[in-house]
């Protein structure tokens, strides 16, 4: 428009076709500006707000903020296997929202989480359950559960520890730990994982155990001829390629003076579950294995008595969001960020701390 003149100063009527233009910068750029005077105004492109300089600092003029939609994969630490014909550890709880991919326990994909730029949220990567060592006199009750993993309001439950001699069942967890001779596997958590496998009864000098539950399948029952296998994990493409995680640990088997072979080992479930071990009075077949780090895999059980089981694998937290945003951490977390198509993917592999988007 033509505008009006007041005391020699022309104020232009821009109309709706000529909006007032304010210089836009990122938050980092604004904080680096120099030479400002009180009343200067800029647009913060990260937070979606107008800011005015008061002579000392920049202050937001409006309450409007940008919302960030985040897809996630949150896997807790896996439970450790046990010793003394111990079962396999259960996989860490598995919760997923990306691309309609399933969560653990056969449940549907969860909803994406929405947060606001500049708002802090917590990320915690759960540790795997610590290995246990048998004493040879039947005093080991159970191995150890894994620790929970957290993204904001989303929490996944640590995998269940396994049962051990004598008469100790598997523990409940994200996925349940496998039972020891003549006991049941632990229960998995609804929407996160499956139950651990049961263990068959003693057969002479043969003692068996069940496999740990996985995010994608229950652990199998242990037999006199073979320890139970760990349950399978679940595949996700949140990082841009398909990766299977959260497999249960294989069970351990003790066969006394009977023949033993590698074929009797309880195999770890696909997705990071550790293999178990078979032992007779002369030999050990395949030393037990730990669950794979950052998969939440369960640890393998051991057939022997004065032996050490497989530790559970640590968990992982993976976040996928628009590449328009960046994530920052206040410390205490180990993570990397990669660009995948039009998104960024941040993978947290250890620690706990607060983060925010900008």
Where are these regions (language model features)?
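Low-complexity, glycine/proline-biased repetitive segments and flexible coils/loops
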Residues: 69-358
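Tryptophan-rich substrate-binding surfaces of secreted polymer-degrading and adhesive proteins
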Residues: 56-64
């Amino acid at each position: 428009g033509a505008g009006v003149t007041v005391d020699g100063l022309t104020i232009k009527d821009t109309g709706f076709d000529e909006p007032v233009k304010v210089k836009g910068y990122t938050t980092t750029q604004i904080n680096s500006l120099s030479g400002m005077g009180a009343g200067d105004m800029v647009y913060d492109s990260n937070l979606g707000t107008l800011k005015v300089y008061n002579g000392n600092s920049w202050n937001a003029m409006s309450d409007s903020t940008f919302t960030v939609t985040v897809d996630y994969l949150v896997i807790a630490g896996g439970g450790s296997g046990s010793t003394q014909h111990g079962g396999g550890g259960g996989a860490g709880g598995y919760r997923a929202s990306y691309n309609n991919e399933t969560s653990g326990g056969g449940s549907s994909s969860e909803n994406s989480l929405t947060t606001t730029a500049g708002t802090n949220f917590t990320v915690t990567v759960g540790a795997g359950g610590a290995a246990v060592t048998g004493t040879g006199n039947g005093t080991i009750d159970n191995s150890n559960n894994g620790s929970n993993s957290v993204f904001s309001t989303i929490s996944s439950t640590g995998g269940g520890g396994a049962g051990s001699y004598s008469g100790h069942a598997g523990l409940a967890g994200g996925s349940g730990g496998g039972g020891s001779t003549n006991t049941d596997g632990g229960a998995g958590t609804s929407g996160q994982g499956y139950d651990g496998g049961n263990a068959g009864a003693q057969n002479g000098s043969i003692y068996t155990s069940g496999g740990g539950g996985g995010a994608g399948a229950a652990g199998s029952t242990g037999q006199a001829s073979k320890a139970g296998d760990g349950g399978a994990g679940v595949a996700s493409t949140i990082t841009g390629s398909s990766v299977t995680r959260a497999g249960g640990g294989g069970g351990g088997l003790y066969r006394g003076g009977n023949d033993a072979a590698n074929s009797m080992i309880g195999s770890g479930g696909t997705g990071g579950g550790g293999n178990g071990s078979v032992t007779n009075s002369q030999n050990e077949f395949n030393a037990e294995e730990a669950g794979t780090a950052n998969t939440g895999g369960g640890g393998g059980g051991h057939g022997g008595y004065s032996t050490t089981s497989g530790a559970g694998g640590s968990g992982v937290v993976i976040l996928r969001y628009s590449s328009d945003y960046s994530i920052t951490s206040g410390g205490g977390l180990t993570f990397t960020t990669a660009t995948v198509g039009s998104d960024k993917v941040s993978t947290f592999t250890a620690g706990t701390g607060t983060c925010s988007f900008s």
